[in-house]
Amino acid sequence: MFKKIIVFTSCFLVFACAGDNGKITYVEDLTTLKNTSSGQVIGFKHINNSTAWFGIPYAKPPINELRWRAPQPIEDSEKIIKATSFSDICFQNRSFVDYSEEKENYIGSEDCLYLNIHSPRNLSGNENLPVMVWIHGGGNTTGAGSGYDFSRLASEQKVIVITINYRLGPFGWFYHPSLIETTNSKEDKSGNYGLLDQILALKWVKKNIKEFGGNPNNVTIFGESAGGHNVFSLISSNLASGLFHRAISQ
């Protein structure tokens, strides 16, 4: 068992840069096919001598009867997923992330519980590389995993890097007595749906990352701003016990 290490940084150098949330689709590469609990995912050869899989679902869409409920894992599936473009970002206020004069005040979708994986290129799946899971900032009201390009970090430092989406704003952190009348689940009643999303994403990583050449027993979570606060919440949560081994908070 690795000892958890908390690192505080004022200058956070991760060799990453902000990306684009647009629907760019990359050319699939069948040699990147991986079997996961979400299905058979096909990625692509990315920049900086890396391989990537974008838009892999790690939970059922949190809509309708699953809105304001703990996220539900996807049952083992054999469907083929072309993981060559980012998913929709989670529902959020446009003004915080996009200052263009559009009619709509909000962007994104409730169907947003997806993750993205960056790895060094041409791995066999037996490398047992360290794993890093990025938790984005944005006051828990804005942001997305697709806003960061970790291809260089993955290829140069020989690590597997995952970025995740989690529910934001009132969809991620909201409590009202009328919402819990029909459930006996403590998690459903907590109102901490965004944090529960992060925990389920970490469970997905633990279950599936070995297929991508990662070591499920060497996982570091790292985040900045609200993501950094979420790192501390994950450290203190019994529900996240055993899902990661090191932590970095900015």
Say what each PLM segment does.
Residues 17-192, 216:
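Non-catalytic accessory segments of hydrolases
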Residues 112, 186-211:
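Alpha/beta-hydrolase active-site loop
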Residues 137-138, 193-197, 225-228:
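Active-site loop->helix "elbow" adjoining a glycine-rich segment at hydrolase catalytic centers
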Residues 205, 212-224:
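Alpha/beta-hydrolase fold nucleophile elbow
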Residues 228-240:
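Short glycine-enriched nucleophile-adjacent loop
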Residues 241-250:
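A conserved short beta-strand
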